[in-house]
Amino acid sequence: MDTNTLLLILANIIVIIGLARLIGLLFARFQQPPVIGEIIAGIMLGPSLLGLLSPALEKSFFPATTQPFLYLLSEIGLIFYMFLVGLELNPQYLRQKLKVAILTSNVSIFFPFVLGIVLSFFVLYSLNQPNKTSFIPFALFIGAAMSITAFPVLARILKDTGLDKTPLGTLGLTCASVDDISAWCLLAIAIAVTRTDNIFGAFPTLLGIIVYTVFMVTLGRKFFKYILRNYGQKNYLSQGLLTFIYIMVILSAMLTEWIGIDVIFGGFILGAILPKNTNLSTELATKTEDFVSTFLLPIFFAYSGLSTDLGLLNKPYLWAVCALVVAAAIAGKYCGVYVTTRALGVEKQEAKALGWLMNTRGLTELIILNVGLKLGVISPVIFTMFVIMAIITTIITSPLVVKIYPAPAH
């Protein structure tokens, strides 16, 4: 790497994290999750705004020579973000209203997933898709992208609106926890099928990830309990222990990539099996989250923004398809949640609010889309449409939930 490239990468990082922080704070002032502002900041640095205003500046500031380095940093950011998602997956949520949560979450995945598959028939052959895209992998990715709920963003919305301690907050966190596990399993299947190009060929990969997950949940969990109990210095997370855990996160990511699933699953699995509700786990989350959220994730948003080009939607027909994607995603999730919870005896207002809460997609949607784009399953046009869907479904959540189900403080 020559000096000019190094300086340009450092300049990229300065602009990326600075703009992400600025736009994130701006959105927070309007009671929106800062992550939405950070996603939009990334889009602003790509062809949708910077490239539109000055194509020459965009190409010179984000040339092809720097993008591999941004990609590497964004992948590392995703590994550790997924580690945090797993770490925050608290078992106490899974024990509360479990029957309602399991039924609601699975139906709320099934409805939009089916709509996604139906939509795939239309989208695959009518839009400019990669030539070698097969229907089954494409449909699985579209279904997964329509079905996901962003647990961390949902938790942040509940906290910011003062609803985290209410019955709605408890049920929402429980449903989102179950939804998270189910949706990541669905994505794992989509990746396995895509990489082998057929369902039966994916069986060895799926068997491998099942064996690894079972191993981590049983022996791995016991091992880390022992490590944290014996090497945590009076509930203090030493640099040595922190280093060991980070090495294990990367090693777990390497193993899931080697098995044939994406690196993000390694981070998620390791975070999920670590002991929860201890001073050490809290300190681990705190030390990790600040650097990941302020430095690494904005780079991921910027890298995603370079692939998001609103200019690709240059015909009314394409915007109509985009509107159809947004409508199907919202309707599938909302109807799945509302119908199920009402059938299970949940009050009408709570069921309505939960339907909108579970529509929160945010950053989690971006992760699925980037995996699909990386594997060549979805085109930049479809990528852009689903990024728009992720932003819209997340932006509308807070105001609608507060209007339907105001917290006691309101």
From Swiss-Prot:
Q: Which residues form a coiled coil?
A: none
InterPro entries from the entry? Answer: Cation/H_exchanger_TM, CPA2_transporter, Na+/solute_symporter_sf
Q: Which GO terms describe its cellular component?
A: membrane
- Which GO BP terms sit in this record? proton transmembrane transport; sodium ion transport
- Transmembrane stretches in the record are 7-27, 33-53, 69-89, 107-127, 135-155, 173-193, 199-219, 241-261, 291-311, 319-339, 376-396
Topology within the bilayer: Multi-pass membrane protein
Q: Where in the cell is it found?
A: Membrane
The record's PANTHER family line, in alphabetical order, gives: CATION/H + ANTIPORTER, K(+)_H(+) ANTIPORTER 1
Function, in words: Na(+)/H(+) antiporter.
Q: What's this protein's name?
A: Na(+)/H(+) antiporter NhaS4
From what organism does this protein derive? Synechocystis sp. (strain ATCC 27184 / PCC 6803 / Kazusa)
